[in-house]
From Swiss-Prot:
HAMAP family: ThyX (MF_01408). This is Flavin-dependent thymidylate synthase. GO terms for biological process: dTMP biosynthetic process; dTTP biosynthetic process; methylation. Keywords: FAD, Flavoprotein, Methyltransferase, NADP, Nucleotide biosynthesis, Transferase. Homotetramer. It comes from Mycobacteroides abscessus (strain ATCC 19977 / DSM 44196 / CCUG 20993 / CIP 104536 / JCM 13569 / NCTC 13031 / TMC 1543 / L948) (Mycobacterium abscessus). Pathway: Pyrimidine metabolism; dTTP biosynthesis. Its EC number is 2.1.1.148. A motif (ThyX motif) lies at residues 95-105. It catalyses: dUMP + (6R)-5,10-methylene-5,6,7,8-tetrahydrofolate + NADPH + H(+) = dTMP + (6S)-5,6,7,8-tetrahydrofolate + NADP(+). Pfam families: Thy1. InterPro entries: Thymidylate_synthase_ThyX, Thymidylate_synthase_ThyX_sf. Disulfide bonds: none annotated. It comes from the Bacteria.
Length: 250
């Protein structure tokens, strides 16, 4: 029986910032937020902070987001390693073209002991969970049987690596969308804001909405001056959404 696994989102990389020693400027932030402020001030050479209303990193970046000068957000990035996510969810995730992805390959990694990610709609109903388990176990059994027969059929292929790859890429066609996958995702701050705005909405599928909110929580800790305008709320059905009054890109 396949193991049911929960979503796990781990921040594994973030932007560092090294201030040029010849620029007479300092800020009260570091990392990505400092880099974004530096990029914005570089546009106007406003190193002396002439406007007291934007003298802090937080107030400066708030102004940047309010006026839509979002290109400076593209200099800083964050990378997550995401596990416990279904193949159907990553099919939606990879539509965000400004992210960079490295995903588990079903052509090279055997799926005979793959895990399963439950659709959120069935999680609290034992009968529905049992039906999903039954269906996914049957699919995996078909995968194993098909893989064995394909490897036998392709036995005359001299290259063992190629033979296994050809067998797996054909056998994977019977695996369900609920199969767990694992993926590394890198995005700049602007791309992450857009992803959260689109996918943490109540109109998004619940699984990818959970992913967006899990990313938001870590991004808000990493760069509160960039992501702190998003508020997380709980809907009547118990699921969460995130909204911001400063989202202008659709």
């Amino acid at each position: 029986m396949a193991e049911i696994v929960p979503l796990r989102v781990q921040l594994i990389a973030k932007t560092d910032f090294i201030a040029p020693p010849d620029i007479d400027w300092s800020t009260d932030a570091d990392g990505g937020p400092a880099l974004v402020e530096f990029a914005g001030r570089a546009c106007y050479q406003s190193w002396s902070k002439p406007n007291p209303r934007t003298a802090t990193n937080e107030s400066y970046l708030r102004h940047v987001i309010e006026v839509g000068h979002l290109s400076v957000l593209e200099h800083a990035s964050a990378t997550f390693y995401i596990t416990g996510i279904s193949r159907s969810c990553t099919h939606e995730l990879i539509r965000h073209r400004h992210f960079s992805y490295s995903q588990l390959s079903q052509r090279f990694v055997p799926e005979d002991d793959s895990n399963v990610v439950l659709p959120p709609a069935v999680e609290d109903d034992p009968e529905l969970v049992a039906l999903v388990r039954k269906a996914t176990d049957a699919s995996r059994a078909a995968y194993v049987e098909l893989l064995e027969k394909l490897e036998s059929t392709l036995a005359d292929v001299p290259n063992a690596v190629l033979r296994r790859k050809q067998a797996r890429q054909a056998a994977r066609s019977v695996l369900p969308n609920a199969t767990e996958t694992r993926i590394v995702v890198t995005g700049n701050y602007r791309a992450w804001r857009h992803f959260i705005a689109m996918r943490a909405s109540e109109h998004a599928d619940v699984e990818i909405r959970r992913l967006a909110i899990a990313c938001l929580r870590q991004l808000a800790d990493l760069a509160p001056s960039i992501f702190g305008d998003f508020d997380i709320a709980t809907l009547a059905d118990g699921t969460e959404v995130a909204i911001s009054p400063l989202v202008y890109e659709g």
